[in-house]
From Swiss-Prot:
Described function: Essential serine/threonine-protein kinase that plays different role in the viral life cycle. Phosphorylates the host small ribosomal protein RACK1 thereby customizing the ribosomes to a state optimal for viral mRNAs (which contain poly-A leaders) but not for host mRNAs. Facilitates viral DNA replication by inhibiting host BANF1, a cellular host defense responsive to foreign DNA. Phosphorylates host BANF1 on serine and threonine residues; this leads to BANF1 relocalization to the cytoplasm, loss of dimerization and impaired DNA binding activity.
Residues at which ATP binds: I22, G23, K24, G25, G26, F27, G28, S29, I30, K45
Gene label: OPG187
Species: Vaccinia virus (strain Copenhagen)
The protein, known as: B1 kinase
Domain Protein kinase: residue ranges: 16-282
Amino acid sequence: MNFQGLVLTDNCKNQWVVGPLIGKGGFGSIYTTNDNNYVVKIEPKANGSLFTEQAFYTRVLKPSVIEEWKKSHNIKHVGLITCKAFGLYKSINVEYRFLVINRLGVDLDAVIRANNNRLPKRSVMLIGIEILNTIQFMHEQGYSHGDIKASNIVLDQIDKNKLYLVDYGLVSKFMSNGEHVPFIRNPNKMDNGTLEFTPIDSHKGYVVSRRGDLETLGYCMIRWLGGILPWTKISETKNCALVSATKQKYVNNTATLLMTSLQYAPRELLQYITMVNSLTYFEEPNYDEFRHILMQGVYY
């Protein structure tokens, strides 16, 4: 359905005039609105993923909470957007859910493609640190992102040095009342996320915990450097079991993974991925140590 021209009424009774379609993904379509600072994200209510996003926005992404966390951690920027409003729209046969969220600029995937599918190591390390800061905030609220990738990382409209991790349709609550979720498989959750970057735990049906997001970020950084992961081509065939088995083969062979993907082994990624692979499912990572490792790649 094309929503352009429709007037949507949100939960606060404000009205939004839907403009042209500017993006479409696995978790909804994105349209401009009559306010250039915001976009509206729409999908059928029955799909459920936008409700997951709405819940995450309202429970976790409160500006006051983010600001307080930044001050307490001495971190200048947390790349998470907030939700202006939400609501429901009913057509003749289908009911839709919509969110009104901040409008951003181009995504990192477009930037990488414009640079011949390769970014300088310094840029990759800086992006890695930004995403690490962002997922640390999420993790300390008890949530994992579950779908880190270049197309879900978006530049600010004005300040191109600010990045935002978007699309919260696969967020998972791995902590509740101070208790970590148990290490139990759910066959319905197997292979969630983007196959090329899905963490091994998710392939097996476990809830993505902190180590899963860090694992995915490692795969992404290899790709951003221009590497081709050993399972990249397999991912295109949607052979989930073979992708999972191939990833598992490299868990204790980080140097081989890097040499196969990049034809060289950047010291920072070797240390980063090795440290990620040493984490247990329940373990809280030493984010400062991960930041320190990536920062070495910024200056050397």
